[in-house]
């Protein structure tokens, strides 16, 4: 039986890391696409030459032609401009919207049956636009954000409590940006909710509040440190976790920017929510109950995403 085919649209820092991780996990053969001649070919060859030492079997190739992604089982989209210090994800809207149009048309023409994961920022608006431009089924197009934001939240919590991050469960709702909603009440250490850990004296509410804010600022913190780019290891690892759940029908419960139509009181809208990802794509949106404060924060985040979607429609009339 043929190995799955994974198309990576964009061969920058995230794209190259995605290719390496996909190879190491032997998820399938990898095609790196980029408009920059030589970059995808060079990275593909470099990773392929690591195969004998890393002991993986996967074909790696690079291309500037969408025709070479034909029949891809998974497409992960990282193409676009990355943030620089002082920029918000929203500042990238106009430039990256044009990129999504080109990518969406390329996927529709050559890989219409693929499961598509978008990483390009501003994430929630870009995954919506990518779905519109591609015309693929909503359950086959989603955005990588919640897995990354939750991973950052879990890392900070594990550091605070000095425990294994394997025992920390946490997830984040809402848009991928300053308005994201890390849910303290639903986050646990070995099954113990964070509010109970405050009562037990393991931490303080002030420290938890600081961790929540650091989670919101997680991407900007790395942009500020790198100065010439944005995060790539953690975003790539998060997207691979989603792709693996799809390819292996693991049915993992993972937060991502998914199409919500009825749940959370939303109608036909992409935003970060817990989902089940399996062979059918986003097979289910998990609707949780929120208290008044959580709902207010989620509504604020949804409104921010709606503003970005409206801006996209203002830029490209075909989206209206």
From Swiss-Prot:
Q: Which residues bind substrate?
A: 83, 89, 121, 152
Q: Can you tell me which residues form the catalytic site? A: 176 (proton acceptor)
Domain of life, per the record? Answer: Bacteria
Q: Which reaction does it catalyse?
A: (S)-malate + NAD(+) = oxaloacetate + NADH + H(+)
What keywords were assigned to this record?
NAD, Oxidoreductase, Tricarboxylic acid cycle
The main enzyme category here is oxidoreductase
Q: What Enzyme Commission number(s) does the record list for this chain?
A: 1.1.1.37
Q: Name one GO biological process term.
A: lactate metabolic process
Which ranges does the record mark as transmembrane? none
Quote the InterPro entries the UniProt record gives.
Answer: L-lactate/malate_DH (IPR001557), Lactate/malate_DH_C (IPR022383), Lactate/malate_DH_N (IPR001236), Lactate_DH/Glyco_Ohase_4_C (IPR015955), Malate_DH_type3 (IPR011275), NAD(P)-bd_dom_sf (IPR036291)
The record's annotation in Pfam families points to: Ldh_1_C, Ldh_1_N
Q: Does the keyword Oxidoreductase apply?
A: yes
Secretion signal span: none
Q: Name one GO molecular function term.
A: L-malate dehydrogenase (NAD+) activity
Binding residues annotated for NAD(+), in chain numbering: 10-15, 34, 96, 119-121
Q: Which family does it belong to?
A: Belongs to the LDH/MDH superfamily. MDH type 3 family.
HAMAP family associated with the record: Malate_dehydrog_3
Q: Which NCBIfam families match?
A: MalateDH_bact, PRK06223.1
As for what it does, the entry says: Catalyzes the reversible oxidation of malate to oxaloacetate.
Q: What is this protein called?
A: Malate dehydrogenase
This chain is encoded by the gene named mdh
